[in-house]
C-alpha cells in the first residue's frame, strides 16, 4: 500500500518523465497577488504565466502545491471534522502546459498515471469522467482514443443559471482566460450512498472527484463572448488526500496514513480512547494548516491572514478542551507532523522550534479566556428562543473573550442552534464606526485627487528642481488657484520630494515662485501623482506656474539615516533572534525609527544589547551602500529580503550594504553607513500577539537622548545624596528600608484586623444550626483577610466564613471552613463559584481558599449567591 509521500513523489516522477519541470510549491502567502488571501490552487503561482505577463524557461511544469481554504471566498473551516473530505490545508498535485500540449496529451497523461501498472494501477472500471456538454473533442478523446466506455462518460451542461457557468467550465474571472474542463471520478462502491455526477445524489460519498483537467482555450470578452486563445494551455489539479484515500482503500481522507498518525498522537496526548471522535479529526487537520501558515510567515493577529490563523488555532484549542485537555497540547503535534509529511515536512523541521513557540503562546493566551467564554455561552444557550443565539451574545464572545464567530457557531451547531448573524454584523459595524470616529485621519484625498498624469520622482540624487504645477486641490476639491493663507495639495509634473511609502514619511520643504511661497508640510502619493500638502505663506499659486521645489535637506538627511538604520536593524534582528524574524511594519521619520517584526517572545536585555552592538559595528565600518535595479528573479537569487504581502513589479530596486543587508526598497538611503553616526535602541514592546516593536534613535537624536539619560542619573544621585557610581547601591538600601517599614505596617494592620474579627464574630448567623459569617468589607487586603478568617475560626471552633473586600477597584475574596464542616462545604469550590460572579477566578484547599475579581459592582450579588449555595449544602 502506497503512503501519501510515495503517491506525491510518484506523481512528480511521472510528469518529470513526460518532460515537465518539477517546480517547488509556492508559499501559502501568495507572492505579488494581494487579491488572494491564501494560495488555494496549484495554478496560483503560474497566474501571470497563463495571462501572458510572465515568461518561464519551461512550457511544462508539475507541482505538489500546499493550499489553504479558510477565510474569504474559499472557506471550508466550518465543515472540517464533520465530513470525510473537507480540510483547511491540503496538497494539490498539478501538471501544467503553457501553450505546449493540449487536450489529447493532458487526458492521455492522466489516464496513464491512474491506470498504468507502473504507476497507480487503478481498475479502469472504477473510473468515470465528465466533460462539458459541447466539448465533443474531449468526449472523443476519452471514448475513441483512451477507450472509456460511453456509459462512463457524462456530459455536464450549464447548471448555474447563465451561459458558460458549469461545474465543467472554468474561468479565471468575469473576463479573461477560461475554458471547459474534464473531471475524473472514482467509484468507492455500492456500500456507499451517492449518485453519478449530474444526478440529484451527486453529493454522496460513492463517486468522488479525484482529478480536474482545465482546458484554457478561450478569452472571455467584456460582452460575454468567447474568443479563441492563440496558444491554449492546460491547468490540472489532483487532490493528494483524496487520491491517497483511493489508494489506501478507505473512503474518508481522515482514515489515510498521515491523518491516522496525527489522530493517534492527539489521542495519546489527551488520553482519548475513541479514535472516531470528530474533535480528533479537527485537531489533526488544523495542525497542518497552522504549522504551514506559520512557516510561510503568517503569525496570529486580529486582522487579515493572521486572524484566519488565530481562528484555526482557537478552534483546535476548543476541540482539545472538549476532549479534556487541561494544558497546552496543540504545539506538541508539530514534530509528529514534520516526520509524517515526508519530504514536504522538511521546511517544518527547519523551523520546528519557532512554530511550536508561536502555537504555544497563542494556545496559552486563549486558554485564559476560553473557560469564561464557554461558561457565558452555555448560559446563553439555555435561554435561546427559536433555536437562535442572539448576535449580541456572539459579538460579546468575539469582542471580550476572543471567540471567532465560527468557533461560537461550532458550539451552537452541536445543539442545532443557529446564530443571528445579521445582528452580529450590526454590532461589528457599530464597532468599526466607533474605531473610525476615534481615529485621527483627515479628509480622504484618494477619492478626490484624480489626475490623468504622472509625477516623475527625481529626488534620489537631488534636493531641488524646477517643475510645473499640473493640479491644485483645496477644501477637498480641485481648484485652479490658491491664495495666501489657504491650505492646499499641489501636484507637480516632477518633484524632488519623497512621498510617504514603505514606512518612510513624506518630505517637507518649500515651493516658490517669484510671487509665491508655499510651505510643504508633507508629501503623499495619490495613484501616480505626488501631492505636496501645505499652505500658501504669501502670494498665490496657479495651475501652469513654473516653480522651484526645495526639500528640507536637514530633515531629509535625518530621515535617510533612520531608513538605512532600519535595514541594519532588520539584519541584526535576524542574526540574533533567528530567520523567522520578518518585518511587519515600520515608521521612518526624522526623529525616530520604529520597527515591527514577527517574534512571539519578548526580546531580552542581553539580546537588545547584542543587536545594538551589531548595528553600531556596521556603522563604524562605514559600509558602502549600493543601489541597483534588476528583475525580481535575479533579486531573489541574490538572497534579497522582501516583505510578505508587498506587490513588486518585474523590475525592483535593491539596496545593499555589502552582504550584511540586501533588501528590496524604494526609500532614500545614505551613501555610507558611517553617515548614520550612532544607533541607540530606546524601547521594546508587544504590538499584538506574535509581533514585537523596537524604537531607536540615530545621530544627533541618539546623542541628545544619551545626554538626557546622563542628566537624569546625575539628578537622581543628587536627590539621594550620593554619587552616580553609588546610585544603584543607594537604591538597594532604600528598598530594604521600605521592606522593613512595610513589614511593620502589616503588623499594625494585622492587629486592627484581629480587632475587626472580634466584632465580626458578633455578626454570626445560623443556617440549619451551623455558624455562618458572610460580610462585605472595604479596603481590606488579602493578607489581612486571611488573618481575620483564622481568628474567627479559632474563636467559633465550628464556622463557615465568607468575606468579600473591595480594595483599589478590585475584589478580594476568601472562604474559610473549619475542618469539621469541610466535608459539606468545600472552600475551594465555593470561592471559585463566587469569583465567577465578579469576573475572576481562584481556588484553594477545602478549608481555606482565596480568589480575586475585577467587577466590584457585582459583589453584593456574589455574596447573596454564596449564602444560597451554603444553604443548599447544609
Swiss-Prot record:
GO cellular component: cytosol
Keyword list, A-Z: Aminoacyl-tRNA synthetase, ATP-binding, Cytoplasm, Ligase, Metal-binding, Nucleotide-binding, Protein biosynthesis, RNA-binding, tRNA-binding, Zinc
Annotated EC: 6.1.1.7
Record note on cofactor: Binds 1 zinc ion per subunit.
Highest taxon listed in the record's lineage: Bacteria
Record localization: Cytoplasm
BP-aspect Gene Ontology terms: alanyl-tRNA aminoacylation; negative regulation of DNA-templated transcription
The protein's required cofactors: Zn(2+)
CDD domains tied to this protein: AlaRS_core
UniProt-annotated binding residues for Zn(2+): 563, 567, 665, 669
Pfam family, one: tRNA_SAD
GO MF annotations in UniProt: alanine-tRNA ligase activity; aminoacyl-tRNA deacylase activity; ATP binding; tRNA binding; zinc ion binding
Record's catalysed reaction(s): tRNA(Ala) + L-alanine + ATP = L-alanyl-tRNA(Ala) + AMP + diphosphate
Function of the protein: Catalyzes the attachment of alanine to tRNA(Ala) in a two-step reaction: alanine is first activated by ATP to form Ala-AMP and then transferred to the acceptor end of tRNA(Ala). Also edits incorrectly charged Ser-tRNA(Ala) and Gly-tRNA(Ala) via its editing domain.
Domain remark in the UniProt entry: Consists of three domains; the N-terminal catalytic domain, the editing domain and the C-terminal C-Ala domain. The editing domain removes incorrectly charged amino acids, while the C-Ala domain, along with tRNA(Ala), serves as a bridge to cooperatively bring together the editing and aminoacylation centers thus stimulating deacylation of misacylated tRNAs.
NCBIfam families: alaS
UniProt record similarity statement: Belongs to the class-II aminoacyl-tRNA synthetase family.
Entry protein name: Alanine--tRNA ligase
Amino acid at each position: 500500500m502506497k503512503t501519501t509521500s510515495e503517491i506525491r513523489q510518484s506523481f512528480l516522477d511521472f510528469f518529470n518523465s513526460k518532460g515537465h519541470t518539477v517546480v517547488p510549491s509556492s508559499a501559502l502567502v501568495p507572492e505579488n497577488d494581494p487579491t488572494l488571501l491564501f494560495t488555494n490552487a496549484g495554478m496560483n503561482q503560474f497566474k501571470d504565466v497563463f495571462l501572458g505577463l510572465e515568461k518561464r524557461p519551461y512550457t511544462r511544469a508539475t507541482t505538489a502545491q500546499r493550499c489553504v481554504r479558510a477565510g474569504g471566498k474559499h472557506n471550508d473551516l466550518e465543515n472540517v471534522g464533520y465530513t470525510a473530505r473537507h480540510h483547511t490545508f491540503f496538497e494539490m498535485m498539478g501538471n501544467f502546459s503553457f501553450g505546449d500540449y493540449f487536450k489529447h496529451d493532458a487526458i492521455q497523461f492522466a489516464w496513464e498515471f491512474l491506470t498504468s501498472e507502473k504507476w497507480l494501477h487503478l481498475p479502469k472500471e472504477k473510473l468515470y469522467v465528465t466533460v462539458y456538454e459541447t466539448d465533443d473533442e474531449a468526449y472523443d478523446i476519452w471514448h475513441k482514443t483512451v477507450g472509456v466506455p460511453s456509459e462512463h462518460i457524462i456530459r455536464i451542461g450549464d447548471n448555474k443559471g447563465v451561459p458558460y457557468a458549469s461545474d465543467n467550465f472554468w474561468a479565471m474571472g468575469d473576463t479573461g482566460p477560461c475554458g471547459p474542463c474534464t473531471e475524473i471520478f472514482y467509484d468507492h462502491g455500492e456500500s456507499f450512498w451517492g449518485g453519478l455526477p449530474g444526478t440529484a445524489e451527486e453529493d454522496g460519498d460513492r463517486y468522488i472527484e479525484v482529478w480536474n483537467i482545465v482546458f484554457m482555450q478561450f478569452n472571455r470578452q467584456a460582452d460575454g463572448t468567447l474568443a479563441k486563445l492563440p496558444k491554449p494551455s492546460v491547468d490540472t489539479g489532483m487532490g493528494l488526500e483524496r487520491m491517497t484515500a483511493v489508494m489506501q482503500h478507505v473512503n474518508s481522507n481522515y482514515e489515510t496514513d498521515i491523518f491516522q498518525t496525527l489522530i493517534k498522537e492527539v489521542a495519546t496526548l489527551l488520553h482519548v480512547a475513541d479514535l472516531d471522535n470528530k474533535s480528533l479529526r479537527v485537531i489533526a487537520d488544523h495542525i497542518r494548516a497552522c504549522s504551514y501558515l506559520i512557516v510561510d510567515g503568517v503569525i496570529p493577529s486580529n486582522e487579515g491572514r493572521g486572524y484566519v490563523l488565530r481562528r484555526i488555532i482557537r478552534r483546535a484549542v476548543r476541540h482539545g478542551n472538549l476532549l479534556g485537555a487541561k494544558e497546552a497540547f496543540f504545539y506538541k503535534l508539530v514534530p509528529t507532523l514534520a516526520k509524517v509529511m515526508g519530504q514536504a515536512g522538511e521546511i517544518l523541521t527547519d523551523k520546528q522550534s519557532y512554530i511550536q513557540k508561536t502555537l504555544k503562546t497563542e494556545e496559552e493566551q486563549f486558554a485564559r479566556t476560553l473557560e469564561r467564554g464557554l461558561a457565558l455561552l452555555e448560559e446563553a444557550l439555555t435561554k435561546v428562543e427559536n433555536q437562535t443565539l442572539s448576535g449580541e451574545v456572539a459579538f460579546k464572545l468575539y469582542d471580550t473573550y476572543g471567540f471567532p464567530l465560527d468557533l461560537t457557531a461550532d458550539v451552537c451547531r452541536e445543539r442545532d442552534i443557529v446564530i443571528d448573524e445579521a445582528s452580529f454584523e450590526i454590532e461589528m459595524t457599530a464597532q468599526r464606526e466607533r474605531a473610525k470616529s476615534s481615529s485621527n485621519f483627515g479628509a480622504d484625498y484618494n477619492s478626490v485627487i484624480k489626475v490623468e498624469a504622472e509625477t516623475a520622482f527625481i529626488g534620489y540624487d537631488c534636493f531641488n528642481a524646477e517643475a510645473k504645477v499640473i493640479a491644485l486641490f483645496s477644501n477637498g476639491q480641485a481648484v485652479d488657484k490658491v491664495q495666501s493663507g489657504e491650505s492646499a495639495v499641489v501636484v507637480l509634473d516632477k518633484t524632488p520630494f519623497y512621498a510617504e511609502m514603505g514606512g518612510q514619511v513624506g518630505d517637507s520643504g518649500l515651493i516658490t515662485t517669484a510671487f509665491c511661497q508655499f510651505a510643504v508640510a508633507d508629501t503623499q502619493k495619490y495613484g501616480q501623482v505626488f501631492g505636496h500638502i501645505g499652505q500658501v505663506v504669501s502670494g498665490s499659486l496657479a495651475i501652469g506656474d513654473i516653480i522651484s521645489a526645495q526639500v528640507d535637506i536637514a530633515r531629509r538627511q535625518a530621515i535617510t539615516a533612520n531608513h538605512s538604520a532600519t535595514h541594519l536593524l532588520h539584519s541584526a534582528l535576524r542574526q540574533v533572534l533567528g530567520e523567522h524574524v520578518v518585518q511587519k511594519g515600520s515608521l521612518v521619520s526624522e526623529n525616530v525609527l520604529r520597527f515591527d517584526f514577527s517574534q512571539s517572545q519578548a526580546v531580552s536585555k542581553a539580546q537588545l544589547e547584542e543587536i545594538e552592538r551589531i548595528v553600531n559595528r556596521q556603522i563604524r565600518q562605514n559600509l558602502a551602500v549600493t543601489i541597483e535595479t534588476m528583475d525580481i528573479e535575479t533579486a531573489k537569487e541574490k538572497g534579497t529580503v522582501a516583505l510578505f504581502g508587498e506587490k513588486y513589479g518585474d523590475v525592483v530596486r535593491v539596496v545593499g550594504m555589502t552582504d550584511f543587508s540586501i533588501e528590496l526598497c524604494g526609500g532614500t538611503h545614505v551613501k555610507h553607513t558611517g553617515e548614520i553616526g550612532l544607533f541607540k535602541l530606546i524601547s521594546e514592546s508587544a504590538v499584538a500577539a506574535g509581533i514585537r516593536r523596537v524604537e531607536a534613535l540615530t545621530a544627533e537624536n541618539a546623542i541628545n537622548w544619551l545626554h538626557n539619560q546622563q542628566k537624569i542619573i546625575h539628578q537622581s544621585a543628587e536627590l539621594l545624596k550620593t554619587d552616580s557610581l553609588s546610585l544603584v547601591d543607594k537604591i538597594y538600601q532604600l528598598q530594604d528600608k521600605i521592606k522593613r517599614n512595610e513589614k511593620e505596617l502589616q503588623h499594625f494592620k494585622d492587629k486592627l484586623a484581629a480587632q475587626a474579627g472580634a466584632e465580626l464574630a458578633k455578626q454570626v448567623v445560623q443556617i440549619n444550626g451551623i455558624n455562618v459569617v458572610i460580610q462585605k468589607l472595604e479596603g481590606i487586603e488579602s493578607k489581612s483577610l486571611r488573618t481575620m478568617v483564622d481568628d474567627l475560626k479559632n474563636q467559633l471552633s465550628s464556622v463557615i466564613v465568607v468575606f468579600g473586600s473591595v480594595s483599589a477597584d478590585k475584589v478580594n475574596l476568601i472562604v474559610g471552613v473549619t475542618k469539621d464542616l469541610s466535608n459539606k462545604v468545600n472552600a475551594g469550590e465555593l470561592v471559585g463559584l463566587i469569583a465567577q460572579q465578579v469576573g475572576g477566578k481562584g481556588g484553594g484547599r477545602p478549608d481555606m481558599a482565596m480568589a480575586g475579581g475585577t467587577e466590584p459592582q457585582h459583589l453584593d450579588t456574589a455574596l447573596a449567591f454564596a449564602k444560597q449555595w451554603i444553604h443548599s449544602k447544609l
